[in-house]
Amino acid sequence: MPVAHVALPVPLPRTFDYLLPEGMTVKAGCRVRVPFGKQQERIGIVVSVSDASELPLNELKAVVEVLDSEPVFTHSVWRLLLWAADYYHHPIGDVLFHALPILLRQGRPAANAPMWYWFATEQGQAVDLNSLKRSPKQQQALAALRQGKIWRDQVATLEFNDAALQALRKKGLCDLASETPEFSDWRTNYAVSGERLRLNTEQATAVGAIHSAADTFSAWLLAGVTGSGKTEVYLSVLENVLAQGKQALVMVPEIGLTPQTIARFRERFNAPVEVLHSGLNDSERLSAWLKAKNGEAAIVIGTRSALFTPFKNLGVIVIDEEHDSSYKQQEGWRYHARDLAVYRAHSEQIPIILGSATPALETLCNVQQKKYRLLRLTRRAGNARPAIQHVLDLKGQKVQAGLAPALITRMRQHLQADNQVILFLNRRGFAPALLCHDCGWIAECPRCDHYYTLHQAQHHLRCHHCDSQRPVPRQCPSCGSTHLVPVGLGTEQLEQTLAPLFPGVPISRIDRDTTSRKGALEQQLAEVHRGGARILIGTQMLAKGHHFPDVTLVALLDVDGALFSADFRSAERFAQLYTQVAGRAGRAGKQGEVVLQTHHPEHPLLQTLLYKGYDAFAEQALAERRMMQLPPWTSHVIVRAEDHNNQHAPLFLQQLRNLILSSPLADEKLWVLGPVPALAPKRGGRWRWQILLQHPSRVRLQHIINGTLALINTIPDSRKVKWVLDVDPIEG
């Protein structure tokens, strides 16, 4: 009897075997309903079908129901998901279900759902409306129904309610019916509807190069300075793709930040543009997903998880702001959407465009190795003038709310000229260091030349590279000052302390806390554009693609947090943030200014960025990473473990380290650091520790991990901790 090997959404790296009853057939990629646990049925996805099982056949339960006649995934997405589960060492069931809309996970049909509507019956058309005058809601409802059908999901917006319609139904005056939406083929009347901008020479060259390779895999880095017209290149490439009857996937870092982008695509093309993001309800998400799969959607714009959308005939993938860290999932299945998008493009044999003003070092490394091709856009639209740059030395300055006196003076000047000011504060990813405010001394580990991380709760300094520790000094060993401060300031604290400095000036704080509610970001941005807010306080969210014509002063307040972080990636993140931020000032014919506050104005990173630009920084950083044998020249895997008592996690990781180093696959090129506390050592009441594995060969490191995972359950403490694997981590 055939055996179905079924993936279930459980945290176990295996499939489960079920018998297929006589007469029941199923294909890999189809959903089934199966018994699981005590008196419980679950939805599963068939990974394969065979005639054998590791268990005796008489011990296997049978599949209850097959939900699909054809796989819910296209062939290319199926291959992508199976490969990704293996590469990221994540349970196959969790991976497959992550890629499905919630309603499909729950067993809903993978087809356009019938759309229900109310209509007036023959009796309802003939009855005297005055007979309902004692029930005004019913009278209103029937009068409306006589004008035509009313869709069920529209009732909530009307003057009457569902109860009135149900009452009319009991009287035989109205009823419910349904119809399945017909497929509409946009290809029959496709045309470019919006206004085309004339491409400059660089843009035209880029579009032509990509078009010439349209029928095979090619990866293109579109490196364009802020305001150089990358979106116009995307639009022109999509014109060519849609003209061939193919579809396009456009991925963006934060869907809430790009209402302008969506509008530009919808205005440009006389074809359906669907949007996939976390703000959609379940029905909207399923509808967009199905339209992409059946070819009804010409363009899908979405965030990270949109990568797994099935397409009938995909012709190109665009990754906008490809350097953005939000493409990396940080919880659960820790995949990187940019990297998987390249795999998908290769599998589908189509071009992929990676666009950025500040490309990731991994992407630039692939360009150096001839895996990707480089296209440059160097001219800003309208020949806008670059912002004037200032570095303010904070040493010995009496700061207010984290602002130097010179910055406060500049802010007043710009505000008096009826302009707007942005203050950037970006703690995320920058580990706190200990700094002397008077002389600029930074607490540094003597064993490995990295900066100590300040642990406030334990009141000690700890090196996250070699694990050496020391108490927090009472005074600066360089100048004797007792003014030792942790680097960093919070946006909320800044907002509160700015108010008395600028009385009567409207202040708007834009960060994760203030924009979590649906529509909150759009509302705040509209207020900014109306001039309702004069001072904007924000994190890196504000650096992503917004155009603020009245912003003429931009200041970065916590530069030192990036310069002296324990995370080797923080310099790259800061360089990207600074370059993006500098493009926010003075974009509408007004001269812009950018101010950086630091205790170390002579720092080489600042000097390179200010006077040579991001490209020079990236070249220098890649050379340094190569010399230090850090990614992208080597591969990293982090194993994190956590517990409630701060005992089992480090013990488990030490046992795991011993297991790895004793493996016959481990060679002299494998480097293992730890166990050390995670950069955020305590979260949610749990203590977090980690070990880092590094190897110059990605393939070899994968083999080592595979061999280790097969034996991990032999470690005594493995069941006393929660542990996760992070392949190609982007945070220390």
From Swiss-Prot:
Changing T482A: Binds and unwinds replication forks, moderately impairs PriB binding, PriB stimulation of helicase, and DnaB loading onto forks. GO terms for biological process: DNA recombination; DNA replication; DNA replication initiation; DNA replication, synthesis of primer; DNA-templated DNA replication; double-strand break repair; plasmid maintenance; replication fork processing. The keyword Metal-binding applies. Changing K230D: Loss of ATPase and helicase, allows assembly of primosome and replication of phiX174 DNA, does not complement a deletion. No change in DNA binding. Zn(2+) 1 binds at C436, C439, C476, C479. Changing H483A: Binds and unwinds replication forks, strongly impairs PriB binding, PriB stimulation of helicase, moderate decrease in DnaB loading onto forks. Residues 487-627 are annotated as: Helicase lobe 2, C-terminus. It is an enzyme of class 5 (isomerase). ATP binds at G224, V225, T226, G227, S228, G229, K230, T231. Binds 2 zinc ions per subunit. InterPro entries: DEAD/DEAH_box_helicase_dom, Helicase_ATP-bd, Helicase_C-like, P-loop_NTPase, PriA, PriA-like_WH, PriA_3primeBD, PriA_3primeBD_sf. This is Replication restart protein PriA. It comes from Escherichia coli (strain K12).
